[in-house]
Amino acid sequence: MDTAEIRRRFVAHFEHNTTVGAHTPVPSASLLLDDPNLLFVNAGMVPFKPYFLGQEAPPYPRATSVQKCVRTPDIEDVGKTTRHGTFFEMCGNFSFGDYFKEGAIELAWDLVTRPLADGGWGLEESKLYPSVYEDDPEAVALWKKVTGLPEERIIRLGKRENYWSMGVPGPGGPCSEILYDRGPDYGPDGDFGPKGEDRYLEIWNLVFMQDELSAVRSKEDFDIAGSLPKKNIDTGMGLERVAFLLQGKANMYEIDVMFPVIQKAEELTGRRYGADHDDDVRFRVVADHVRSSMMLIGDGVTPGNEARGYVLRRLLRRAVRSMRLLGYEDPALPELFPISRDKMGETYTALHRDWERISTVAYAEEHAFRQTLRSGTTIFDQATAELKQAGGSQLSGDKAFALHDTYGFPIDLTLEMAAEQGLAVDEVGFRRLMNEQRQRAKDDAKAKKGQHRDASAYRQVADSLGRPVEFTGYDVVTDEASVRGLVAAGGVVSSAGPGDDVEIILDRTPFYAEGGGQLADQGVIELDNGARVEVRDVQSPVRGLIVHHATVLSGEVSIGLGAHALVDVERRRSISRSHTATHMVHKAFREALGETATQAGSENSPGRFRFDFSAVGAVPESVMADVEARVNEVVLDDLAVHAEVMSQADAVKSGAMALFGEKYGDRVRVVSVGDWARELCGGTHAGSSGKLGVVKLLGESSIGSGVRRVEALVGSDAYRFLAREHVLVAQLSDTLKVRPEQLPERVHDLVEKLREAEKEIERVRVGQLLAAAGELAAGAAKVGPVNLVAHRADGAGGGDVRTLALDVRGRLPQGEPGVVVVIGAVDGKVAVVAALNDEARARGLSANELVRAVGPLVGGKGGGKDDVAQGGGTDASRIDEAITLVTAEVGRVAAG
């Protein structure tokens, strides 16, 4: 049975169920949800969290889904075991205060054991073992009742294995797992603990949410405050695990949606999966990471150095690196990505629709990584050459870590290349530094997590309201309302006085809360009792709640007072113009660069905006000019900007663009600029394109691999910028005595003349330097048999000092020992260069030793080889002492 059929049967089983009732099939959410505690959706229940936490009323009593998930805590372990991967699909059924334990057990057992011919999965009952939480006798009784299994077949496990919580106060409860016995080839009989996971494979976990947890200290240490008012069901079944069982495969990497990638990798590398353990790990890494990275890019992630982008970059580069370790050094992703697309695209059709964008991002990252490998190889070669010259045999952990951390050079390649040269690598030191870096990252993550404020006060206010705060700002900028909640210092309060910072919740508001790239409104709220507050910021910390961050200017604010809310109109209009301009620039870039130029982020502020979008390489100036011209053409056309609410399906049919990573409901708001640009958007906008006045693009830059940023001005801000530019051009024209259109040519001529003058100055300076070299060589002092030039060159920097020293050495008498040390100083910075000929080195003299001796005297250090060495320092006052030291040191060694 192929994976698509397993998925179809799962959804159909719940959608058409008549035992507990039909479940609403819910499409998979994006891998990216607005959750500060999650990089990616990592469980099937994540999109339903607001319902389980009581933040929102569920729109259905029962639901079923097959959710895309990514888990990346141990990327480096992927492939080493065959049970886990970074991307997986989690099949689940959910009950929100409807059926409970018995219904969940019946539904799961029925699907798992029902014969294939009847639409089930046909697993043998004799190989199935239910597990329960050891303190849940109700579950034991229900499993016996539903399945008829004897009690000894029902496995009791502790909190670590069979009690679920979110790791924080909130809902929790015991769970039951369905374990599949793979037989004695995979482990001993009866070991249902962690060591027996290979044999007794968990295929389905049923979570019975029944408890309210007041404190959670660890997986096994928590306090149960009482029972939840409504009991819920959350189940999760790993699609890939069931697939490899039903397809008769040894592990998830061999199922129909993954193994074709391994087969293609076999074809490319000439190696065979199953022939070598290390190669097998690499094949599995390739299969997993290609699929994971493709799905992440599909949902809008782009490679970067932080957070989601960094995870994607690691996945892509590990896949490329694994192919290299398998012996394939050509671009691999263009060969592998289409294989995964064809398999996953049967279910996730957007992979085909967005293929140009997905492939462009992935292939560009591989190209960048291949360049990194080339530069890293150069650094590696330098490090090993120095190591061999020093007589060493082990590359230090510091050097291996620097190659990995600074140059992106994988440790596996460092180990492989070192072994080829007969060298070892200090892996212990490398791992220590890696662990220290991981710990710093964890500490940073904890610190950032701590910055997210406790939402309990907001939930308390939201519960008291009973309905979402009504946003009226699409239609008005002033409105009458009443104060329904006050929050200060993280807690609910009843009043606030002059000078107090307070968060105010009204029952309705014209103030726009920051979101969708648009900054929040500002303004004032006037209370019926004469009090007045200044609104500095507006946020929506929990769904349905709009919170005004304010300072009380006068009077006292208390719950129940009537309020007159006044938005700063000019600021709102300016931001709205920026937001409309962002939509227009987005559309213009897609026209100029193609459909791959999708928005990756934005910020709309008063009079200016920034717009991030997917693109490979810098955008040519000609394209920037075309985009700016196109946008301003639409401004002159004065197209009406209008918004309408429709179903998401109708919005897609209308051609409206949706932004990756944004979460949309069944009903969406579509903003259109005439019939030209159409996007899903919840922000505020200008009434027509003509209201923008003028749009000026300031420039574009890279903010990460495959992502460019454009910054621009709108309206009066753009006009003022252009006016300043006009004045500047007029001043330059007057100064250079040419017309404005002749300025580029005139400036070019001036720059060329300046360059020629600089070259002439350099020729004169070098000539003077070389003339001095002849005089210095002729005046060399005799220190025993050695011709010594120890010279102070004030005003000479490092490059000149080196040139002078080498030239003087070449002018000393042939066949006699010669030593040259030149010490220069510019702006207090000291440069030291020593140059020796072969005869001097034969007498035991060393440029490296001379520079190392001089370095501390001039407040620095240095070194190099025996023939040429250089150094620097910061204490020019002791240069004469250094010259004396050189003379003494040469005399001492020469005499010995």
Curated annotation (Swiss-Prot):
One of its GO terms (cellular component) is cytosol. InterPro entries: aa-tRNA-synth_II/BPL/LPL, Ala-tRNA-lgiase_IIc, Ala-tRNA-ligase_IIc_anticod-bd, Ala-tRNA-synth_IIc_core, Ala-tRNA-synth_IIc_N, Ala-tRNA_ligase, Ala_tRNA_ligase_euk/bac, DHHA1_dom. It is found in: Cytoplasm. Its main location: cytoplasm. Keywords: Aminoacyl-tRNA synthetase, ATP-binding, Cytoplasm, Ligase, Metal-binding, Nucleotide-binding, Protein biosynthesis, RNA-binding, tRNA-binding, Zinc. It catalyses: tRNA(Ala) + L-alanine + ATP = L-alanyl-tRNA(Ala) + AMP + diphosphate. Gene3D superfamilies: 2.40.30.130, 3.10.310.40, 3.30.54.20, 6.10.250.550, Bira Bifunctional Protein, Domain 2, Threonyl-trna Synthetase, Chain A, domain 2. Residues 439-459 are annotated as: Disordered. Its cofactor is Zn(2+). It is an enzyme of class 6 (ligase). GO terms for biological process: alanyl-tRNA aminoacylation. Its EC number is 6.1.1.7. The keyword Glycoprotein does not apply. One of its GO terms (molecular function) is ATP binding. Residues 439-456 have a biased composition (Basic and acidic residues). Binds 1 zinc ion per subunit. CDD domains: AlaRS_core (cd00673). Zn(2+) binds at residues 579, 583, 681, 685. Consists of three domains; the N-terminal catalytic domain, the editing domain and the C-terminal C-Ala domain. The editing domain removes incorrectly charged amino acids, while the C-Ala domain, along with tRNA(Ala), serves as a bridge to cooperatively bring together the editing and aminoacylation centers thus stimulating deacylation of misacylated tRNAs. Catalyzes the attachment of alanine to tRNA(Ala) in a two-step reaction: alanine is first activated by ATP to form Ala-AMP and then transferred to the acceptor end of tRNA(Ala). Also edits incorrectly charged Ser-tRNA(Ala) and Gly-tRNA(Ala) via its editing domain. HAMAP family: Ala_tRNA_synth_B (MF_00036_B). Belongs to the class-II aminoacyl-tRNA synthetase family. This is Alanine--tRNA ligase. It comes from Nocardioides sp. (strain ATCC BAA-499 / JS614). The lineage of its organism: Bacteria, Bacillati, Actinomycetota, Actinomycetes, Propionibacteriales.
